[in-house]
Swiss-Prot record, chain A:
[4Fe-4S] cluster 1 binds at residues 381, 384, 387, 430. Its EC number is 7.-.-.-. It is a peripheral membrane protein. It is found in: Cellular chromatophore membrane. [4Fe-4S] cluster 2 binds at residues 391, 420, 423, 426. Binds 2 [4Fe-4S] clusters per subunit. It comes from Rhodobacter capsulatus. This is Ion-translocating oxidoreductase complex subunit C. The gene is rnfC. Its cofactor is [4Fe-4S] cluster.
Curated annotation (Swiss-Prot), chain B:
This is Ion-translocating oxidoreductase complex subunit B. GO terms for cellular component: plasma membrane; plasma membrane-derived chromatophore membrane. Keywords: 4Fe-4S, Electron transport, Iron, Iron-sulfur, Membrane, Metal-binding, Nitrogen fixation, Repeat, Translocase, Transport. It comes from the Bacteria. Signal peptide: none annotated. It is found in: Cellular chromatophore membrane. Induction: Expression is reduced under iron-limiting conditions. [4Fe-4S] cluster 2 binds at residues 112, 115, 118, 152. It comes from Rhodobacter capsulatus. [4Fe-4S] cluster 3 binds at residues 122, 142, 145, 148. Binds 3 [4Fe-4S] clusters.
Length: 519, 187
């Protein structure tokens, strides 16, 4: 039996809770009162072809092509991929490689556009009236607009909207938790564009054919809760605004589902197995723009924050704007930042090169000073268990860490390494400052590398076998050919001999006849 | 004529029977370990180990003439699997198994004459290209055996560490001890 928590007395909906989690200092006050402003046109726009989970998009423009705002410049390749559109009008100056907005800083295929400053729209996508449109049409429109999950996971949204064919869906949860410290872009979007978001939610609910819709917002965003409560109906759906406690990682898809429905998603399963689909607030906004106005996903809201930024802000920027230009727009650095991050401080990516572009999944740009980053000095693990308390998926991080450092990665996988979200609660909680989540990231990468090498070995074995079989077949064919030719030669010889033999007798008989005739 | 044929046939049959009998009598059992080793090896017969094909290496390893780490294209996984079945006598204690970075062949297109020599030599068909056309290496199929490098007449092929992509990149292993030491010395 489940005992209700005291919180249920105040919020009757709040009868469930999640395991673990932490309550970090949010630092949201830096930007929570900054209205979303539109960033001026950047000098260059760089669009990596892979801004989503799945296959890389295929470029359909060449160098020196002129493109218009909203024009399709890279096409989705395969079912799990996303279209990419030109965020403004201008000239394509390169289709090549550029540093990825990723911790590795590896070069990735990128289209570079120099804006002409006119910002001239090309043809929009055909508008859709969601009230009359079939669910498939809505999903197709969302796919055409290149919309991906904008909370950071960047999973193509259209694929998620098409899940009704495979799963029995009952609930749509809109994720407005924004549990990462510093970030306020979703908060501001809800406060300023609640009506548009509500419409986007309605469109998505219609495409999914769900029965109920929840909008989950953390309790530290009272204005956003108020705004969304005001606009809580669209397309015949009335959303339940669900206030969830301020706790990291509340914005994790599976945890949000647990918090609202009380159901736990099994390891490595999808929330769709429970009949629940989770979409982000910013995705709902993008869906609204795509369906009602035919605007593809070419801009997004980004929080620029951290004590290293002179003028923290919430900006609406074109996808592909270089981070360095955004920072310059925000007054530059107050001091040389210790770390420059894309995303939140808990799960964001540190970047070395500030010229990398903002992509579809970038929700924050943080310049953290040395005072804001954790102390590097570490001490030995004393198995205090703080990491275990903090882990939202119920793992034992200290054990995982010990196994990884002993080189026993398979053993770590056996005790749940693959279920780690990489949320960083363990490292945050660790009083010895051990780099726990960092070790898990390494171990996961190492294991998947081993897996892929094993796979490759099997494949090359197959290739070698195929080659051997082919060579043998060729040799056999040659042999057959030789035999055939030999047989042919023999037959020819025989025929010749026979012909010679046949040719010989006639003269003999002729002489015989002659001889017979002479007497 | 008939006598000649009969005598030759009799000779053939007799010698053949002798050979057959000798094969039975002096039959040498292939140790099952050789087959087991050969099963684990990649089986591409690339020759990177210096032995005549994977079977050659398997035999040498069974006799203890080759370390379990001899197969470079197989890398760490193959070495570990071999170390499990080939006991210490076969050289499993040949030092700790180093993590070998996977290598791939790379064609310098300026130097390639399209002679097709590498193309014919590649054990996994990882090189593509036609006659008098620049060849290229399919990286996912290349096992880094260097067979093509040896046959290239213009030295247009080199062995390189397989380039990392966003899908294969991962974080380095954090070294907490080192961090503590450096922080202390700094203090």
């Amino acid at each position: 039996m489940r005992l209700p928590s005291i919180a249920t007395l105040f919020h009757p909906l709040q009868s469930f809770s999640i395991r673990g989690g932490i309550h970090p200092e949010t630092h949201k006050h830096l930007t929570s009162e900054c209205e979303i402003e539109t960033m001026p046109m950047p000098a260059l726009i760089r669009l990596p072809l892979q801004q989503h989970i799945g296959a890389e998009a295929e470029p359909i423009v060449k160098r020196d092509d002129l493109v218009l705002k909203g024009q399709l410049i890279a096409k989705a390749r395969g079912p799990l991929s996303a279209n990419i559109h030109a965020p403004t009008s201008g000239r394509v100056i390169a289709v090549g490689h550029f540093v990825a907005p990723h911790a590795s800083g590896l070069p990735v295929p990128t289209i570079t556009i120099r804006p002409d400053g006119e910002d001239k729209w090309g043809p929009h996508l055909p508008r859709l009236r969601p009230e009359n449109a079939a669910p498939e049409e809505i999903a197709a429109q969302v796919a055409a607009a290149g919309i991906v999950g904008m909370g950071g996971a960047t999973f193509p949204s259209a694929v998620k909207l098409n899940l009704r064919a495979k799963y029995d869906l009952t609930t749509l949860i809109i994720n407005g938790a924004e549990c990462e410290p510093y970030l306020t872009c979703d908060d501001r979007l809800m406060r300023e564009r609640a009506e548009e978001i509500a419409d986007g939610i309605g469109i998505m609910a219609r495409a999914l054919g769900v029965k109920q819709v929840f909008v989950a917002i953390e309790s530290n965003k009272p204005q956003a809760i108020e705004a969304m409560t005001r606009y809580n109906r669209a397309l015949g759906y009335t959303f339940k605004i669900h206030v969830v406690p301020t706790q990291y990682p509340m914005g994790s898809e599976k945890h949000l589902v647990k918090m609202i429905t009380g159901q736990e998603t099994p390891a490595r399963a999808l929330t769709a197995d429970l009949g629940v689909v989770v979409h982000n607030i910013a995705t709902a906004h993008a869906v609204h723009l795509a369906v009602r106005y035919g605007e593809p996903l070419i801009a997004r809201t980004v929080t620029v924050s951290g004590h290293g930024i002179r003028r923290p802000a919430n900006l609406r920027v074109l996808i592909g704007t270089p981070v360095s230009e955004i920072i310059a727009h925000c007054g530059g650095f107050t001091e040389e930042p210790d770390r420059l991050l894309l995303g939140g401080p808990m799960m964001g990516m540190p970047i070395q090169n500030p010229r990398v572009p903002v992509v579809k999944g970038t929700n924050g740009i943080l310049a953290l000073t040395a005072a804001e980053t954790p102390e590097a000095k570490t001490m030995p693990c004393i198995r205090c268990g703080r990491c275990v308390q903090g882990c939202p998926v119920g793992l034992t991080p200290f054990e995982l860490n010990a196994r990884i450092h002993a080189g026993d990665l398979e053993g770590a996988a056996k005790v749940g390494l693959m279920d780690c979200l990489a949320c960083g609660c363990c490292s945050y909680n660790c009083p010895a400052n051990l780099p726990l989540v960092q070790s898990f990231q390494f171990a996961k990468g190492k294991l998947s590398e081993r897996q892929s090498r094993k796979h490759q070995q099997e494949e090359t074995k197959r290739l070698a076998a195929a080659r051997k079989a082919r060579e043998e077949a060729i040799a056999e064919a040659k042999k057959q050919m030789m035999l055939k030719r030999k047989a042919e030669m023999a037959a020819k010889k025989k025929a010749e001999e026979a012909a010679a033999a046949a040719a010989m007798p006639p003269p003999a008989t002729a002489t015989a006849i002659q001889g017979e005739a002479t007497p | 004529m008939i006598a000649a044929a009969a005598s030759m046939s009799a000779l053939g049959l007799g010698l053949g029977y002798l050979l057959g009998a000798a094969a039975r009598k002096f039959h040498v059992e292939t140790p099952p370990i050789v087959e087991e080793i050969a099963k684990i090896l990649p089986g591409t017969n690339c020759g990177a180990c210096g032995f005549p094909g994977c079977n050659g290496l398997a035999e040498a390893m069974a006799e203890g003439n080759a370390p379990v780490t001899a197969c470079t294209p197989g890398g760490r996984d193959v070495a570990l699997a071999l170390a499990e079945i080939v006991t210490v006598e076969a050289g499993a204690d040949a030092g700790p198994i180093a993590e070998i970075e996977p290598m791939v062949a790379f064609v310098f297109e300026d130097h390639c004459t399209g002679c097709q020599k590498c193309f014919k030599r590649c054990p996994t068909d990882a090189i593509v290209g036609g006659a008098k056309q620049i060849h290229t290496v399919v990286m996912d199929a290349c096992i880094g055996c260097d067979a093509c490098i040896e046959v290239c007449p213009t030295e247009a092929i080199v062995s390189r560490v397989k380039p990392k992509t966003l899908k294969t990149w991962y974080w380095d292993k954090p070294q907490p001890g080192l961090v503590a030491a450096s922080a202390e010395t700094a203090a």
